[in-house]
Amino acid sequence: LKPALPGFPGLGRKLLNILKTPWEGPSWKTVPAGAFEDLFFIARPEKANEYIALVKEILTKYTYPHTQLGVYVQPIEHNRACQIEFTFFYDPENEAEKAEIAAIALEAGTELLKRGAQFTRPYGVMVPVIYDRAGNYTATLKRLKNIFDEKNILNPGTLCF
């Protein structure tokens, strides 16, 4: 960044510090329970209610209270699509709760995928599910990784392999 922005002398230096530390303390997402699992994807806006109902229905099979489910819907592309995000908050010290959240996210993500949700940035428990279904994509990622990192020293294990 430039040290000064037009009309705002010295803001460039201040802005860099603000961007590096947007808030003090832990992330707002860890405050409710200590940890969270996100399930996010792209969908058609008219499918949002169906997907929310599906996840709430899946929750009835588990002990996780649906009132603690975080739901975020962000219209994109002038509302031709939307990003939908489900956040499952849990106590990272409670192994049973952690395992239950992983099971919920995996079941919900798999069902959402079957119903047309587009997981364009696989994350968490959905990584193996998405990459297993996208063999050509995975093979292409491996070839690209090999071109730029022949010795596999940059972030080994962080892609789908």
Predicted segments, located by residue:
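Conserved glycine-rich FAD pyrophosphate-binding loop
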Residues: L1-F161
